[in-house]
C-alpha cells in the first residue's frame, strides 16, 4: 500500500429538519470545493432555537487526501 497523507478540517452543517440532514448538507457543500473526501466524523451536535424555530447543527471533522500546497 502506498503512503498517503490526509488533511482534516472542521465544518458545521445546519438544517431545520434533522441532524442527519445537517450533516448531509455540510458534506454535500464540501464536495463542491474538496476532492477525494474520505471520512466524516460527527464531533458535536446542538439545536439552535430562535423565535420557537429549531435549527439542528452538526460539527464534523472531514478528511480528504492531502496533495500539498498549504
Kindly label every feature range from the protein language model.
Residues 1-70:
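N-terminal, polar/charged subdomain of small-to-medium soluble alpha/beta proteins
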Amino acid at each position: 500500500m502506498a503512503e498517503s497523507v490526509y488533511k482534516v478540517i472542521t465544518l458545521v452543517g445546519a438544517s431545520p429538519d434533522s441532524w442527519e440532514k445537517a450533516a448531509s448538507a455540510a458534506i454535500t457543500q464540501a464536495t463542491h470545493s474538496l476532492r477525494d473526501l474520505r471520512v466524516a466524523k460527527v464531533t458535536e451536535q446542538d439545536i439552535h432555537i430562535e423565535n420557537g424555530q429549531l435549527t439542528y447543527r452538526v460539527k464534523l471533522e472531514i478528511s480528504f487526501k492531502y496533495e500539498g500546497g498549504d
